[in-house]
């Protein structure tokens, strides 16, 4: 019998399991170059405590004290109760019906939305939406005290709601138990989806040059001299118990012309139609919310330069491109809860000039994820994913309050993961599942202080891979840019300026730079 053949199988096993091979020599852990495929799945609008506050071993609701959870009013005095959930807790047409009146006199503390003895609103029900905007998020965080979420919300006490979940209720919870859950992961920027998608791909904040002389002039925010606090309107209710706040102007732009709340892509598919008689591939540039094409360096540029293959798979992208050309309704920002509800501002690369319609760059890298992720799943099953893939589920599968529920998106992402686990590429794959931002929901952990853009509130993140530590809760400090850091590390890319600036700001404020996710993996440093 051939001794080389006898020895081959144990060596192969040892390489995979870090055990001993023939001759007793120890096989070391693989290094980061063993990872050939990186997949990022980007869901929507949930704080860590909202979904994973009960997760065993995590820094969750069991660590919340009355002092750390108590909400104060706009003037800093303790609220006697939480405000009512303005306009009701559940979305119109949703069962159960939880009206505004039914939410009166909620205790000033976190509460379970799905409590059978309370509102009994399960994860299959769509709640109303909540403010999740740049300045409001900072005002709610209140310097790290997290005590003004109710004060500066448009949704009243709903900000303090969470779900009492477990592996039987939430498919991703079960997956988190099998792999790694990061419980110290913060959204990259303050506020909402638009800005956090930009930070996912470029660690940068978009600009609108000469905005004061543009159609967007009316969207320049009115901000106090601290650069953080919106100017409150004279007719704003003095107390959060009397109604939502009103501002002089909570706009989409900063006074120095950065775009920080939802602006529309300059290219179709966009929330703004083409100009009458204009190029159907473009959004109307005269619309106040059309952002000029951006030219900052993004992760796609760095990957291209390094000859690393990559793609952004937008759920329902193909349907949205077609709808923009034909005028088909109920695809882009769908009008009902069953529509695909494609969200143009969730497609960050569609804002960049080097990915304009008609370019080879766009054709190669901005791909249709298909309805229900069908095209993305085809690429998974065939083993043809590029080295770096981003997947954005369509609107009704992304877990965003106001237009979808938790359960639909969570099950969809779990289904996608099951395909990834069976993919020919799985053995050398790392999957990161996270959320763009907190959706306005409270979380008890203070974000580390850094730069003017973030990081914002804590959000869930799962690291799923054959290399991931199993049954592990990772307490390393991360934010959305940690995904870029990981990609940068793995493919030896230059560091984006926003990442370097974020690290410098963290250090200058007495914190550590953000981790790059490798602490969640069984690989050599």
Model-flagged regions — what are they?
Residues 18-21:
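C-terminal motif of bacterial Sec signal peptides marking the signal peptidase cleavage site
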Residues 24-525:
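N-terminal pro-sequences and low-complexity stem/linker regions of secreted or lumenal proteins
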